[in-house]
Amino acid sequence: MAASDITVSGLNKVGAEDAAYLVSKIRTIPGFPKEGILFRDFMPVLADARAFGILMGALEAALPVDVDDFDMVVGLEARGFLFGPALAARLGKGFIAVRKAGKLPPETMSQSYDLEYGQASMEIETNVVHEGVRVLIVDDLIATGGTANAARSLIEKCGGVVAGFSFVMELTGIDGMKSLGDYPTSSLVCMPA
């Protein structure tokens, strides 16, 4: 992948050297989980204290809405669980997990969605989102927008309000961000799918 294929405008508040360092820790694995997919691996970012610190500072600096415009952070399984709780703690907010189907005790609500490589379903506990609670949905990446839109639907079914979406990476050429409509969004790094 050429460096010119990577856009790091969401990292503009961390400086060019830190942005380059962070991007250098993101691996690209062709053909995983199936042929034709370019998997973007963030695990090396988490294993590197400097890169993880840069990432969390950048997520906080690039919020798509003011910190007072939401009450809770929602993280999507699985890698949204890595960044969502850390961001929530930095911001003094609570955290809500949206999980794969069958992983939460009753009572739950579920929503099916399409992945770039298949179909799946996710759930939320009905007692964690209350009427009118405003949330920021956080995930590691947006591709088709299926997961993010399913989470939005779950929050709204529970009576919550989605204030915005924050992603570490956006895969371009798939129009996932467009699928979110007029919601405020942010992404730190854009790479071609």
UniProtKB/Swiss-Prot annotation:
Alphabetical list of InterPro entries matching this protein: Ade_phspho_trans, PRibTrfase_dom, PRTase-like, UPRTase/APRTase
Role this protein plays: Catalyzes a salvage reaction resulting in the formation of AMP, that is energically less costly than de novo synthesis.
Keywords, in A-Z order: Cytoplasm, Glycosyltransferase, Purine salvage, Transferase
The encoding gene: apt
Annotated HAMAP family: Aden_phosphoribosyltr
Family according to the record: Belongs to the purine/pyrimidine phosphoribosyltransferase family.
GO biological process: adenine salvage; AMP salvage; purine ribonucleoside salvage
GO molecular function, a single term: adenine phosphoribosyltransferase activity
Main subcellular localisation: cytoplasm
Pathway: Purine metabolism; AMP biosynthesis via salvage pathway; AMP from adenine: step 1/1
Protein's UniProt name: Adenine phosphoribosyltransferase
Subunit structure: Homodimer.
Catalytic activity from the UniProt record: AMP + diphosphate = 5-phospho-alpha-D-ribose 1-diphosphate + adenine
Enzyme's top EC category: transferase
E.C. number(s) listed in UniProt: 2.4.2.7
Record's subcellular location: Cytoplasm
GO cellular component entries: cytoplasm
